[in-house]
Amino acid sequence: NVDTANAMLLLSRLYLNSPKSFFSFLNNLVEDIDIDVELKVVLQEKNKSSVPDAAIMQESFKIAVETKLHNNFAEKQLLHHLASLEGYNYKFLMTLDPREMESNLKQKIDSECKNKNVIHINLTFKKLIEAVKEVVDDRDIDMQNIIADYERYCYDSDLIPDDWKRMRVVLSGTSFESNKANNLYS
């Protein structure tokens, strides 16, 4: 899926540019939970039988991503994705679509995720872009250009709805003169 690949390219570029920004992005998406998955370097860490000079460690985490274009998420498929997250300390299911997930399905998925200690992150492509912009410095021209390119791709591919730009107009047949007289067209 090209749309998933491009979204993951954006996130991988964010990580390569600044792991700290990537982890801030992740933390911002799950406001109520403090996620500590950044790389840690510890000197002289004591354990039961030894004290190594240093340790480099990182908590295990996995983000399973499912992208749809017409909000046609299948509950069964999403629940099967949860199995792929077993064994990780921090588990995320990211659902990505041009529109918000239907509320009944979101409640079911959120409930199942909670039971399995998985964090469900439901995003639109627009919200994904906004969340990335939030953690990237305005002076970081390279990342700003990457975000702008991705945003342009999303608009060109109809991943960000622009129906708010349209107005439904009912044509006036017999009432045109009356509408004009009442200044409806000014």
Describe each region flagged by the PLM.
Residues 1-186:
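Charged, terminal alpha-helix-loop-beta segments
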